[in-house]
A protein has these predicted regions:
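Basic, flexible Lys/Arg- and Gly-enriched helix-loop patches that mediate nucleic-acid binding at interfaces
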Residues: 1-199
Protein backbone atom coordinates (compact mmCIF):
# COMPACT_ATOMS: atom_id res chain seq x y z
CA UNK A 1 0.00 0.00 0.00
CA UNK A 2 0.97 3.60 -0.58
CA UNK A 3 1.29 5.33 2.81
CA UNK A 4 -0.12 8.86 2.97
CA UNK A 5 2.14 9.80 5.91
CA UNK A 6 5.17 9.07 3.75
CA UNK A 7 4.23 11.87 1.36
CA UNK A 8 2.49 14.73 3.17
CA UNK A 9 1.57 17.63 0.86
CA UNK A 10 2.77 15.73 -2.21
CA UNK A 11 0.99 14.79 -5.42
CA UNK A 12 1.01 10.95 -5.50
CA UNK A 13 0.07 9.09 -8.68
CA UNK A 14 -0.04 5.44 -9.75
CA UNK A 15 0.26 4.91 -13.52
CA UNK A 16 -0.58 8.59 -13.99
CA UNK A 17 -3.76 8.58 -11.86
CA UNK A 18 -3.92 10.57 -8.62
CA UNK A 19 -4.10 8.29 -5.59
CA UNK A 20 -7.06 8.78 -3.27
CA UNK A 21 -7.11 5.29 -1.72
CA UNK A 22 -3.86 5.01 0.22
CA UNK A 23 -4.72 1.47 1.31
CA UNK A 24 -4.63 0.15 -2.27
CA UNK A 25 -1.71 -1.97 -3.42
CA UNK A 26 0.51 -0.67 -6.20
CA UNK A 27 3.59 -1.82 -8.04
CA UNK A 28 6.40 0.43 -6.70
CA UNK A 29 7.61 0.98 -10.28
CA UNK A 30 4.27 2.66 -11.10
CA UNK A 31 4.29 5.13 -8.18
CA UNK A 32 5.30 8.77 -8.70
CA UNK A 33 5.56 11.53 -6.10
CA UNK A 34 5.36 14.98 -7.62
CA UNK A 35 6.15 13.32 -10.97
CA UNK A 36 9.30 11.49 -9.83
CA UNK A 37 9.90 7.98 -8.46
CA UNK A 38 9.64 8.01 -4.65
CA UNK A 39 12.74 7.91 -2.52
CA UNK A 40 13.39 4.51 -1.01
CA UNK A 41 12.72 4.17 2.71
CA UNK A 42 15.58 3.55 5.13
CA UNK A 43 17.34 0.35 4.28
CA UNK A 44 18.67 1.29 0.84
CA UNK A 45 21.21 -1.17 -0.58
CA UNK A 46 22.68 -0.60 -4.03
CA UNK A 47 25.02 -2.72 -6.12
CA UNK A 48 27.16 -0.49 -8.33
CA UNK A 49 29.68 -1.36 -11.05
CA UNK A 50 32.32 1.20 -10.09
CA UNK A 51 34.33 2.54 -13.02
CA UNK A 52 38.01 3.42 -12.81
CA UNK A 53 38.64 7.09 -12.00
CA UNK A 54 36.16 7.60 -9.15
CA UNK A 55 36.95 7.62 -5.42
CA UNK A 56 34.75 6.21 -2.64
CA UNK A 57 34.99 9.34 -0.48
CA UNK A 58 32.33 11.96 0.21
CA UNK A 59 35.11 14.57 0.30
CA UNK A 60 34.99 16.20 -3.13
CA UNK A 61 38.54 17.52 -2.64
CA UNK A 62 39.72 13.94 -3.28
CA UNK A 63 38.31 14.03 -6.81
CA UNK A 64 35.21 12.79 -8.62
CA UNK A 65 33.38 10.25 -6.47
CA UNK A 66 31.00 7.31 -6.86
CA UNK A 67 28.19 9.27 -5.20
CA UNK A 68 28.03 11.55 -8.25
CA UNK A 69 26.53 8.55 -10.09
CA UNK A 70 23.49 8.53 -7.78
CA UNK A 71 20.26 10.46 -8.30
CA UNK A 72 20.34 13.76 -6.34
CA UNK A 73 17.69 12.54 -3.89
CA UNK A 74 19.94 9.65 -2.83
CA UNK A 75 22.99 11.90 -2.42
CA UNK A 76 21.16 13.97 0.20
CA UNK A 77 19.61 11.10 2.18
CA UNK A 78 19.70 11.05 5.94
CA UNK A 79 21.22 8.74 7.03
CA UNK A 80 23.87 9.27 4.37
CA UNK A 81 24.51 6.67 1.68
CA UNK A 82 28.04 5.33 2.04
CA UNK A 83 30.13 2.57 0.49
CA UNK A 84 30.54 -0.81 2.17
CA UNK A 85 34.31 -0.95 2.06
CA UNK A 86 36.19 1.01 -0.56
CA UNK A 87 37.72 0.51 -3.95
CA UNK A 88 40.58 2.84 -4.83
CA UNK A 89 40.47 5.23 -7.78
CA UNK A 90 42.30 2.77 -10.05
CA UNK A 91 40.10 -0.24 -9.19
CA UNK A 92 36.84 -1.13 -10.93
CA UNK A 93 34.09 -3.54 -10.01
CA UNK A 94 31.41 -4.40 -7.54
CA UNK A 95 30.75 -1.77 -4.90
CA UNK A 96 27.89 -1.88 -2.41
CA UNK A 97 26.31 1.35 -1.18
CA UNK A 98 23.91 1.64 1.75
CA UNK A 99 22.43 3.94 4.37
CA UNK A 100 22.58 1.20 7.04
CA UNK A 101 25.60 1.57 9.34
CA UNK A 102 25.00 -1.86 10.93
CA UNK A 103 25.18 -3.49 7.50
CA UNK A 104 28.45 -1.68 6.74
CA UNK A 105 29.93 -3.06 9.97
CA UNK A 106 28.60 -6.59 9.41
CA UNK A 107 30.00 -6.82 5.88
CA UNK A 108 33.38 -5.19 6.55
CA UNK A 109 34.31 -6.59 9.96
CA UNK A 110 37.08 -9.22 9.60
CA UNK A 111 35.37 -11.40 12.22
CA UNK A 112 32.49 -12.09 9.80
CA UNK A 113 34.90 -13.31 7.08
CA UNK A 114 32.78 -12.08 4.14
CA UNK A 115 34.68 -13.13 0.99
CA UNK A 116 35.56 -10.58 -1.66
CA UNK A 117 36.92 -11.79 -5.00
CA UNK A 118 39.33 -9.68 -7.06
CA UNK A 119 40.79 -10.22 -10.52
CA UNK A 120 44.25 -8.77 -11.04
CA UNK A 121 46.74 -8.49 -13.86
CA UNK A 122 50.31 -8.02 -12.70
CA UNK A 123 53.64 -6.88 -14.14
CA UNK A 124 55.58 -10.14 -13.78
CA UNK A 125 54.95 -13.85 -13.98
CA UNK A 126 53.25 -15.34 -10.92
CA UNK A 127 54.93 -18.25 -9.19
CA UNK A 128 52.75 -21.19 -8.11
CA UNK A 129 54.54 -20.85 -4.73
CA UNK A 130 52.35 -17.79 -4.05
CA UNK A 131 49.25 -19.98 -3.70
CA UNK A 132 50.31 -21.67 -0.43
CA UNK A 133 52.01 -18.47 0.80
CA UNK A 134 48.81 -16.40 0.44
CA UNK A 135 46.75 -19.25 1.97
CA UNK A 136 49.07 -19.65 4.97
CA UNK A 137 47.97 -16.58 6.92
CA UNK A 138 51.64 -15.69 7.50
CA UNK A 139 52.17 -13.03 4.81
CA UNK A 140 53.37 -9.89 6.59
CA UNK A 141 52.83 -6.53 4.90
CA UNK A 142 55.11 -3.56 5.55
CA UNK A 143 53.99 -1.38 8.49
CA UNK A 144 51.37 -3.94 9.61
CA UNK A 145 51.48 -5.58 13.03
CA UNK A 146 49.47 -8.69 12.15
CA UNK A 147 49.94 -10.93 9.12
CA UNK A 148 47.25 -11.07 6.45
CA UNK A 149 44.39 -13.49 6.99
CA UNK A 150 44.53 -16.58 4.78
CA UNK A 151 43.62 -15.67 1.19
CA UNK A 152 42.68 -17.85 -1.76
CA UNK A 153 44.84 -17.32 -4.84
CA UNK A 154 44.00 -18.86 -8.20
CA UNK A 155 46.53 -18.25 -10.96
CA UNK A 156 44.61 -17.91 -14.22
CA UNK A 157 47.59 -17.21 -16.50
CA UNK A 158 51.22 -16.19 -15.86
CA UNK A 159 50.17 -12.57 -15.20
CA UNK A 160 46.52 -12.93 -14.21
CA UNK A 161 45.10 -14.08 -10.91
CA UNK A 162 41.94 -14.24 -8.86
CA UNK A 163 42.35 -13.44 -5.17
CA UNK A 164 39.73 -14.06 -2.46
CA UNK A 165 40.07 -12.00 0.73
CA UNK A 166 38.05 -12.05 3.95
CA UNK A 167 39.49 -8.81 5.31
CA UNK A 168 39.92 -5.37 3.80
CA UNK A 169 43.15 -3.61 4.61
CA UNK A 170 44.33 -0.45 2.86
CA UNK A 171 45.28 -1.33 -0.75
CA UNK A 172 45.61 -4.92 0.42
CA UNK A 173 45.58 -6.71 -2.95
CA UNK A 174 48.15 -4.34 -4.43
CA UNK A 175 50.36 -4.58 -1.33
CA UNK A 176 50.18 -8.39 -1.16
CA UNK A 177 51.38 -8.74 -4.75
CA UNK A 178 53.94 -5.93 -4.33
CA UNK A 179 55.43 -7.76 -1.33
CA UNK A 180 56.29 -10.55 -3.77
CA UNK A 181 57.70 -8.27 -6.47
CA UNK A 182 54.61 -8.01 -8.69
CA UNK A 183 52.99 -4.65 -9.44
CA UNK A 184 49.22 -4.78 -9.96
CA UNK A 185 48.42 -3.22 -13.34
CA UNK A 186 44.64 -3.72 -13.34
CA UNK A 187 42.33 -4.63 -10.48
CA UNK A 188 38.64 -5.50 -10.57
CA UNK A 189 36.36 -6.70 -7.75
CA UNK A 190 34.10 -9.39 -9.22
CA UNK A 191 32.24 -10.55 -6.10
CA UNK A 192 31.30 -9.39 -2.60
CA UNK A 193 29.88 -12.18 -0.44
CA UNK A 194 27.33 -13.99 -2.61
CA UNK A 195 26.76 -10.94 -4.84
CA UNK A 196 28.51 -10.70 -8.19
CA UNK A 197 28.49 -8.48 -11.23
CA UNK A 198 26.75 -9.80 -14.31
CA UNK A 199 28.18 -9.45 -17.80
Amino acid sequence: PVAREEFPDKDVTVRGSVVDDFGAKADPADVRVDGAPPDHPAGLLLLLHKPIGLVCSHDEREGPNVYSLLPPRWRTRNPQVTSIGRLDKDTSGLLLLTDQSELVHRLTSPKHKVPKVYRATVSTGLSPALVPLFASGTLQLKDEKAPCAPAGLKIISPREAELTLTEGRYHQVRRMFASQGAEVLTLHRARFGHLELGD
